[in-house]
């Protein structure tokens, strides 16, 4: 209703009182859901706005970030795909590439006994959909990196009939 009152007040200011009366009548005849922005119009606008901007020259972002130079120049990251969880049979979280930072100096907090660090990036893990994206991000920030290639498990061929083979000890007698 706020959008309706704003448009009516704008029409009143621009066209005078007579336009106000006709606008109020036309607003009353239009269902309220037609006044809201429909989802297909938003989706149409989003497809037009997804063009990428490419920059040919490499930009130095160190002055913009505010991160101390010791955290930028001497930083080493590890780019990898995490292994499958051994406790489950699913392969969730093994499709994305992760970037993990090296561990810096840690010390024990004398008051609480917690492990403390002065490194703001040590506990951060970044996720990327492609290895090339992670490498480009590391190069853009000036970090050296190690890439651990994705290990694809070799499928083992198994057959149901092998469970009942006469020359294999799959079933042990109890006597």
UniProtKB/Swiss-Prot annotation:
It is a peripheral membrane protein. One of its GO terms (biological process) is innate immune response. The lineage of its organism: Eukaryota, Metazoa, Chordata, Craniata, Vertebrata. It comes from Mus musculus (Mouse). Keywords: Electron transport, Membrane, Mitochondrion, Mitochondrion inner membrane, Phosphoprotein, Respiratory chain, Transit peptide, Transport. Residues 1-42 form a transit peptide. One of its GO terms (molecular function) is NADH dehydrogenase (ubiquinone) activity. Belongs to the complex I NDUFS4 subunit family. This is NADH dehydrogenase [ubiquinone] iron-sulfur protein 4, mitochondrial. It is found in: Mitochondrion inner membrane.
């Amino acid at each position: 209703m706020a959008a309706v009152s704003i448009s009516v007040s704008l029409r009143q200011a621009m066209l005078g009182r007579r336009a106000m009366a006709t606008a109020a009548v036309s607003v009353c005849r239009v269902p309220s859901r037609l006044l809201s922005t429909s989802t297909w119009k938003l989706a149409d606008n989003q497809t037009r706005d997804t063009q990428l901007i490419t920059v040919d020259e490499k930009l130095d972002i160190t002055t913009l970030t505010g991160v101390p130079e010791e955290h930028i120049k001497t930083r080493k990251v590890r780019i990898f795909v995490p292994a499958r969880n051994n406790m489950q049979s699913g392969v969730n979280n093994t499709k994305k590439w992760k970037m993990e930072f090296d561990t810096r100096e840690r010390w024990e907090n004398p008051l609480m006994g917690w492990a403390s660090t002065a490194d703001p990036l040590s506990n951060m893990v970044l996720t990327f959909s492609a290895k090339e994206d992670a490498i480009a991000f590391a190069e853009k920030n000036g970090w050296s990196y190690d890439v651990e290639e994705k290990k694809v498990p070799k499928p083992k061929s198994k057959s149901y009939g092998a469970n009942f083979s006469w020359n294999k000890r799959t079933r042990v007698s109890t006597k």
